[in-house]
Amino acid sequence: MEKGFSVGWRIRTTAEFRRIYAARQRIIGRYYLLYYRENEIKHSRLGVVASKRNVRKAVWRNRVRRVVKEAFRIRKKDLPAFDIVVVAKASSVEADNKELYECINKLFTQLEKQSKRSSSV
């Protein structure tokens, strides 16, 4: 299993983020919003947004991002070929790492179900 979060697995440019937001497909969780869009490559990619407006302190923003990246790293082989943007909500500050991890895993599971539903139609 890959340990890192290399460039090929990341969403990096503003244009890519905008394209995903424009698709208007999202799943809402307690601590995160997950936006997604099918991509042309064979694997999923991730972008994480933890804005100063929602998550004030840098330490908190980094923690919120770290949990998402770790959950993605563990499940990336199982996820469908989507570009995924995870946006941290203000409520994420109040949660501990376990709650954040459970929330993002739940969102990833819902994404897998969505993709199976849309591919069977």
From Swiss-Prot:
Catalytic reactions of this protein: Endonucleolytic cleavage of RNA, removing 5'-extranucleotides from tRNA precursor
Gene Ontology CC annotations of this record: ribonuclease P complex
The keyword GTP-binding belongs to this UniProt entry's keyword annotation: no
Any one GO molecular function term: 3'-tRNA processing endoribonuclease activity
Keywords: Endonuclease, Hydrolase, Nuclease, RNA-binding, tRNA processing
Pfam families assigned: Ribonuclease_P
EC number(s) on file: 3.1.26.5
GO biological process, one term: tRNA 3'-end processing
InterPro entries assigned: Ribosomal_Su5_D2-typ_SF, Ribsml_uS5_D2-typ_fold_subgr, RNase_P, RNase_P_CS
Function: RNaseP catalyzes the removal of the 5'-leader sequence from pre-tRNA to produce the mature 5'-terminus. It can also cleave other RNA substrates such as 4.5S RNA. The protein component plays an auxiliary but essential role in vivo by binding to the 5'-leader sequence and broadening the substrate specificity of the ribozyme.
Record note on quaternary structure: Consists of a catalytic RNA component (M1 or rnpB) and a protein subunit.
Family: Belongs to the RnpA family.
NCBIfam families: rnpA
Protein name: Ribonuclease P protein component
Organism, as annotated: Coxiella burnetii (strain RSA 493 / Nine Mile phase I)
This protein's encoding gene: rnpA
